[in-house]
């Protein structure tokens, strides 16, 4: 009986040691993969503690001083998309704010920049008078640019752009299904002075009227037939270029190929794709005026950069990637569930061995 107890004790001890060694080997392997992952690129990051902190870090990178800024509601990616070409034209930052409160980090950044005037994009239900009152407390003037809906707001912004420089090209983005495509297109469109008209099926006639009234020569339709049917091309008298892919990732790459000289392309910004977290779009739009100035495109990624995206970067000679709003993770060989499971097994084994020892002492070896 004594030999049997010793044998069982050794088995349990060996099992615990093997479990710990196995878990340790997984961690070592994961650490190695993390170090090697994307090692062919120089990696930089602009990541704050929250969305507002990330905005201020983008602002700090792009603007030492700016007498003007643009405010967009955190609930209106649509207005954010149409605002980027104006922000680029005026060389001013964009901040996304709550409808009734300016985050303290944004307030501090406004003071650092020396902002004297803010353009509020959208109606009062998006950015209320409480925002106006806070601006007054900061001795900052404001001007509201808005229409009765997102389409009309985008038209107002386009007209503002036209006041400073006559527009000959426009882009159409579907405000319902085309937001992901619109976000990553903004830097390239803005750099070329192309305003973005946000529209849906109900506003297409008004969009066509705007194109005709301004003698637009060329129209970029961003997105596939789900966003815009082929019939829209027949209604537009200008030259039409449709940029589309099978999904947001492929459309993203098509946009870059359309507007960028890929032979000279060596840097890129990477943001998360917005599938899980809406704030990812806000990161991209805050970044967009700066990316437009630098002529650096934005690429979508999930938590890990996909094989197709990595190949796209390598094929186009990208050597520097800047991760904005998040840090790209390497492929996981150890998931959180695996860690929890392995830890639970180790704890059970340790408790079992400890319990056996206690029972043995308690019953003087009879167990």
Sequence positions of predicted segments:
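Extracellular glycan-binding segments that recognize GlcNAc-based cell-wall polysaccharides
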Residues: 7-16, 25-364
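N-terminal Lys/Arg-rich, disordered targeting/topogenic segments
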Residues: 1-8, 367
């Amino acid at each position: 009986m004594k030999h049997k107890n010793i044998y069982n004790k050794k088995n349990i001890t060996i099992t615990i040691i093997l479990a710990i060694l196995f878990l340790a080997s997984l961690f070592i392997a994961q650490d190695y993969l993390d170090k090697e992952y994307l090692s062919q690129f120089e990696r930089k990051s602009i990541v704050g503690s929250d969305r507002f902190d990330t905005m201020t870090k983008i602002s700090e990178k792009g603007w030492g001083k700016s007498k003007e800024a643009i405010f967009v509601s955190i609930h209106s990616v649509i207005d954010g998309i149409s605002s980027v070409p104006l922000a680029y034209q005026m060389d001013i930052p964009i901040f996304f704010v709550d409808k009734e409160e300016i985050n303290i980090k944004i307030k501090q950044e406004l003071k650092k920049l020396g902002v004297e005037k803010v353009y509020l994009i959208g109606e009062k239900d998006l950015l209320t008078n409480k925002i106006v009152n806070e601006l007054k407390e900061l001795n900052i003037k404001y001007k509201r640019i808005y229409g009765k809906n997102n389409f009309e707001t985008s038209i107002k912004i386009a007209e503002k752009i036209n006041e400073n420089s006559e527009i000959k090209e426009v882009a159409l983005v579907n405000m319902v299904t085309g937001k992901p495509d619109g976000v990553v297109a903004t830097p390239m469109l803005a750099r070329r002075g192309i305003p973005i008209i946000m529209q849906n099926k109900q506003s297409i006639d008004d969009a066509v009227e705007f194109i005709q009234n301004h003698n637009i020569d060329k129209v970029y339709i961003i997105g596939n037939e789900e966003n815009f049917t082929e019939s829209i091309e027949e209604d537009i008298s200008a030259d039409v270029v449709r940029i589309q892919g099978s999904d947001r990732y492929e459309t993203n790459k098509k946009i870059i190929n359309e507007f960028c000289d890929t032979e000279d392309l060596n840097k890129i910004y990477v943001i998360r794709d917005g599938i899980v977290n809406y704030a990812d779009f806000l990161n991209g739009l805050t970044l967009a005026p700066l990316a437009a100035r630098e002529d650096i495109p934005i690429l979508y990624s999930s938590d890990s950069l996909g094989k197709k995206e990595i190949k796209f970067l390598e094929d186009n000679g990208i050597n520097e990637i800047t991760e904005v709003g998040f840090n790209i993770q390497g492929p996981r060989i150890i998931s959180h569930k695996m860690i929890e499971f392995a830890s639970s097994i180790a704890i059970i084994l340790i408790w079992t061995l400890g319990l056996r020892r206690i029972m043995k002492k308690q019953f003087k070896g009879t167990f």
